[in-house]
Amino acid sequence: MRVLGIETSCDETAVAVLDDGKDVIVNFTVSQVEVHRKFGGVVPEVAARHHLKNLPFLLKETFKKVDPQTVDVVAATYGPGLVGALLVGLSAAKGLSISLKRPFVGVNHIEAHVHAVFLANPTLTPPFVVLMVSGGHTQLMKVNEDYSMEILGRTLDDSAGEAFDKVARLLGLGYPGGPIIDEVAKKGDPKKYSFPRPMMDEPNYNFSFAGLKTAVLYFLKKEKDYRVEDVAASFQEAVVDILVEKTFRLARNLGIRKIAFVGGVAANSRLREKVNDRAKRWGYEVFFPPLSLCTDNALMVARAGYEKAKRGIFFPLYLNADPNLSV
């Protein structure tokens, strides 16, 4: 089964073609990071306008490599995300579905990130615990044997990725904050400053990062003699400790020995280091997508679309964008 996937939920425009849920035929992504850097974050209207410019170009390049008549299913993200951005990809996918006379699958962006891990780990089977951690989301979920997903914990305020962006801005490091702090922190001491770990010891699976961000803000206002590298490393250590502790606690309490980590923050080198260390000590299997599939991409959309199509799940063409969609 050949699936064409389209992703435009935020600031990446992406098109991919995937055969049988595993063989990559085409994988194109155009990032808008440089466009939004001067704003310090993603501007929704600007993102949508760039999708309108980039998507036709990517589809044209895709169909230079793939005969459109060989596509069996068209899939696109319909939420959650920025509504204007979502509508660009969703509308294009519906148009292709009509013109090619092929079925259409709407894909949940969060579910798509989970499917990214299957591309690199084809032997992974549910049930497993997954931490979805990105600029827009921080959620702990259980993936059931039928591939349905249950949210068992979520952030009550900022996402982890949002906290990275805001602290990077406080430190004058620029945007996007996640990869910049990751790199700067390698030159710092993660034990230099003791920042709070909100909700880490509470008997639930929810998160809160707003207080940690505020603690860094007050620290910077109070202290004058500090190294940016040490602050970045100490802040990152606090975030990673919270994510690791909550995720392994959920897996332990559910009696599940397999854990996946997905989303942009799953690319963080310190998170991967501490996860792998604990998994080795505690006897868990852990799974990450490759770095290229942690951020938004269309391969994960095509993979999620494949799974639904394989089960005969298709969507009507009146499906609308849902910026607040949940799993």
UniProtKB/Swiss-Prot annotation:
Keywords: Acyltransferase, Cytoplasm, Iron, Metal-binding, Transferase, tRNA processing. It is found in: Cytoplasm. Fe cation binds at H109, H113, D296. Binds 1 Fe(2+) ion per subunit. Gene3D superfamilies: 3.30.420.40. InterPro entries: ATPase_NBD (IPR043129), Gcp-like_dom (IPR000905), KAE1/TsaD (IPR017861), Peptidase_M22_CS (IPR017860), TsaD (IPR022450). GO terms for biological process: tRNA threonylcarbamoyladenosine modification. Its cofactor is Fe(2+). It catalyses: L-threonylcarbamoyladenylate + adenosine(37) in tRNA = N(6)-L-threonylcarbamoyladenosine(37) in tRNA + AMP + H(+). Its main location: cytoplasm. It holds the Pfam family TsaD. Substrate binds at M132, V133, S134, G135, G136, D165, G178, D182, N268. Its EC number is 2.3.1.234. GO terms for molecular function: iron ion binding; N(6)-L-threonylcarbamoyladenine synthase activity. The keyword Protein transport does not apply. One of its GO terms (cellular component) is cytoplasm. Belongs to the KAE1 / TsaD family. Required for the formation of a threonylcarbamoyl group on adenosine at position 37 (t(6)A37) in tRNAs that read codons beginning with adenine. Is involved in the transfer of the threonylcarbamoyl moiety of threonylcarbamoyl-AMP (TC-AMP) to the N6 group of A37, together with TsaE and TsaB. TsaD likely plays a direct catalytic role in this reaction. This is tRNA N6-adenosine threonylcarbamoyltransferase.
